């Protein structure tokens, strides 16, 4: 069973508010939630919302920051022992795609809002940007350095598209993840047979986050 989303390390009412907000934002697709609806979804009183959220109108941004921070920590912890930057890039994309299948509110939130909230884009682009640069520098990827931004954009777009396909039920996460990873590896210049082997390796469980302070960003 997938680990439940933990968007706030303090736990308690604030974590329940974030979890309920994530679900409502994912379902409705809007940028604001009525406090009464949020209180009902979280199973708490309206006053508890105001006691824990200073500006409810900014809740979408708060949830995006928390989600981004949590997934960054967990993907980094999962791939701590990985030394091949190509495999790290491929595995990172597959972790996002699998989680979209296992936690569909989380996946819908990312699909809906990743294009408009920079902090969500950071969660998807920051680790693979490092991996792609390292792969190009070491010769693992056979592309010119000036093409790194294009490959990174391909990765972000393909991952979101695969997540959406999985949520809609068009593909299994295994197929969507391995096919996306294989094509991204081939775009980087990895030979086809090797790209397929890497993309079809057993995917490790997503590690639990070891929370660390992180500077809050607004989008």
Predicted regions and their residues:
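Basic, helix-initiating cap at the start of DNA-binding domains
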Residues: 1-44, 58-61
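Amphipathic alpha-helical packing segments from all-alpha helical-bundle domains
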Residues: 72, 91, 114-160, 164, ...
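Alpha-helical DNA-contacting segments of helix-turn-helix folds
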Residues: 58-67, 110
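Hydrophobic alpha-helical connector segments
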Residues: 62, 73-106, 112, 116, ...
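Conserved hydrophobic residue
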Residues: 30-31, 54, 141-142, 171
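C-terminal peripheral helix-coil segments that are non-catalytic and often amphipathic
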Residues: 1-2, 130-138, 168-219
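Amphipathic alpha-helical segments used for helix-helix packing
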Residues: 95-118, 125, 129-136, 196-203
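Short hydrophobic/aromatic patch on the recognition helix
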Residues: 42-53
């Amino acid at each position: 069973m997938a680990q439940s989303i933990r968007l706030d390390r303090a736990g308690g009412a604030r974590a329940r508010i974030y979890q309920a907000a994530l679900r409502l934002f994912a379902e409705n697709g809007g940028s604001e939630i009525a406090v009464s609806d949020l209180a009902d979804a979280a199973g708490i009183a309206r006053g508890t919302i105001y006691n824990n959220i200073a500006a409810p109108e900014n809740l979408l941004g708060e949830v995006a920051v928390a989600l981004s921070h949590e997934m960054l920590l967990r993907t980094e912890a999962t791939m701590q022992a990985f030394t091949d930057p190509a495999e790290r890039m491929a595995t990172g994309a597959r972790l996002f795609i699998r989680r979209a299948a296992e936690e569909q509110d989380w996946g819908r939130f990312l699909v809906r809002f990743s294009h408009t909230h920079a902090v969500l884009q950071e969660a998807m682009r920051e680790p693979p940007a490092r991996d792609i640069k390292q792969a190009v520098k070491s010769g693992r990827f056979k592309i010119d350095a000036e093409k790194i931004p294009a490959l990174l954009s391909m990765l972000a777009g393909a991952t979101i598209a695969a997540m959406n396909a999985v949520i809609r039920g068009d593909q299994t996460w295994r197929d969507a993840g391995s096919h996306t990873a294989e094509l991204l590896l081939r775009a980087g210049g990895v030979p086809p047979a090797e790209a397929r082997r890497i993309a079809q390796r057993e995917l490790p469980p997503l590690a639990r986050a070891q929370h660390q302070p992180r500077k809050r960003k607004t989008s």
